């Protein structure tokens, strides 16, 4: 009897402790609410519009440079001046070179812009798109810097050997045309990659690999060791995953606290 009383008292104590626990008073959150709060939100890369705009500016500049060179210099190659004074007070080659410098500055600003947004994408867990466009992001600026070097070399030679002026103009236009072709290919390839990424709206790489584990296929996961990958690439990817998981856990903890305090507020 005494044991039964103690057991009964103990059960009452347990019931009282569970009833007094404020954490157990909260109602369980519905599944759709948790899914809506904890599912990572996709942020598309906003660099496609800027890339297309810069590409249009480049095409317009090269077209104007060719028209200016043909209409202004070819009638009198030794004069280096427009008959209608379109570039007055500048000479034709000077106007073309100044336009080229402005275009290079625009590409430099664009490269900084896309580097900023790609670093943000990498911090959100999209390491694959960051690595696949790593060299492509700076390739356009490298092409324009190489074109600037070629133009500087031509101007140095022209300064020492002024004649024939028409040949130097043809070489300058050839450099601009080659630069346009290379830069066009680079920016188009970059735009296609980013458009596919934005259209697919994938989840972070960690969650995409969880899908591969949940639904096995012939696609090998990149988290583990791969014989075709270098050790540096594997370590870099593991570091990106750790940074993303730390950031994601911090956001989850914050949202859990917000959701846990909502019933108390109501």
From Swiss-Prot:
Keyword Phosphoprotein: yes
Cellular component aspect of the GO annotation: late endosome; lysosomal membrane; lysosome; perinuclear region of cytoplasm
Membrane protein topology class: Multi-pass membrane protein
One annotated GO molecular function: protein homodimerization activity
Quaternary structure note: Homodimer.
Protein's name in the database: Transmembrane protein 192
Family statement drawn from the similarity comment of this UniProt entry: Belongs to the TMEM192 family.
UniProt cross-references to Pfam families, sorted A to Z: TMEM192
Keyword entries, A-Z: Endosome, Lysosome, Membrane, Phosphoprotein, Transmembrane, Transmembrane helix
Residues passing through the membrane, by range: 53-73, 90-110, 138-158, 169-189
Gene responsible for this protein: Tmem192
Residue numbers carrying Phosphotyrosine: 213
Cytoplasmic side: 1-52, 111-137, 190-266
Residues exposed to the Lumenal side: 74-89, 159-168
Residues recorded as bearing Phosphoserine in the entry: 17, 229-230
